[in-house]
Swiss-Prot record:
Family: Belongs to the universal ribosomal protein uL3 family.
Entry-linked PROSITE patterns: RIBOSOMAL_L3
Gene Ontology BP annotations: translation
PANTHER family linked to this entry: 50S RIBOSOMAL PROTEIN L3, LARGE RIBOSOMAL SUBUNIT PROTEIN UL3C
Keyword terms, alphabetized: Ribonucleoprotein, Ribosomal protein, RNA-binding, rRNA-binding
Species whose genome carries this gene: Corynebacterium aurimucosum (strain ATCC 700975 / DSM 44827 / CIP 107346 / CN-1) (Corynebacterium nigricans)
Gene Ontology molecular function, alphabetical: rRNA binding; structural constituent of ribosome
Disulfide bonds: none
Gene transcribed to yield this protein: rplC
SUPFAM superfamilies for the chain: Translation proteins (SSF50447)
Name of the protein in its database record: Large ribosomal subunit protein uL3
Biological function: One of the primary rRNA binding proteins, it binds directly near the 3'-end of the 23S rRNA, where it nucleates assembly of the 50S subunit.
GO cellular component terms attached to this protein's record: cytosolic large ribosomal subunit
Subunit structure: Part of the 50S ribosomal subunit. Forms a cluster with proteins L14 and L19.
Domain of life: Bacteria
Length: 218
């Protein structure tokens, strides 16, 4: 496996804490229980049109797995897992079906991209959803302090443009935060300490991959 090869793993966001770096400065970190995952399928350009590995994470009661999924896991020779995801890469020769993928694959990697599902906030107003300043608190403003205000013209254009930022469902979106620094790797406990915040609530599923922008290595 080359140094610049894309690597990825599934994990669970445990929460945030803080640690000290080499210069005794406090660094806020997010703790991710990364893996262990298992390779359940290998996709190749010849048969599938692209190269990728399929990894599975999290134990699941075999009685709650449908027959197609049961057969898929049985073919791979692994017990049923709760989550399955694909990690695309140029070369899959370093992997084989049934192989375990642990957090130590990120040894030597400095920066990662983390994908997760953001917290759902339900129906939210424009001030909360988009950070609008709102309207004046006095001077004739009548029960419109948190309203959007004007959303377009009258006879022209005679409609509201697509993408106009207004009130609506907020959160519960799949979001990727890029170029986050790996502060520490605890291989024994399968823990990954990532500097800063990552998307999602505690206990949520996240995908951690080597950074695609700016270089994964310092």
């Amino acid at each position: 496996m080359s140094e610049n090869e894309i690597k990825g793993i599934l994990g669970t966001k445990l929460g945030m804490t803080q640690v000290f770096d080499e210069e005794n400065r406090v660094v806020p970190v997010t703790v991710v229980e990364a893996g262990p995952c298992v390779v359940t399928q290998i996709r190749t350009k010849e048969t599938d049109g692209y190269n990728a590995i399929q990894i599975a994470f999290g134990e699941k009661d075999p009685r709650k797995v449908n027959k197609p999924a049961t057969g898929h896991f049985k073919k791979a020779g692994v017990t049923p897992r709760r989550y399955v995801a694909e990690i695309r890469m140029d070369d899959t020769s370093a992997y084989e079906v049934g192989q375990e993928v642990k957090v130590d694959i990120f040894e030597g990697v400095s920066f990662v991209d983390v994908t997760g599902t953001t917290k759902g906030h339900g129906y939210a107003g424009a001030m909360k959803r988009h950070g609008f300043a709102g309207q004046g608190a006095a001077h004739g403003n009548q029960a419109a302090h948190r309203r959007v205000g004007g959303i377009g013209g009258a006879s022209f254009p005679g409609r509201v443009f697509k993408g106009k930022r207004m009130a609506g469902r907020m959160g519960q979106d799949r979001v990727t935060t890029q170029n986050l620094k790996i502060q520490k790797i605890d291989a024994e406990s399968n823990l990954l300490l990532i500097k800063g915040a990552i998307p999602g609530a505690r206990g949520g599923l996240v995908t951690v991959k080597t950074a695609v922008k700016g270089g994964a290595h310092a």
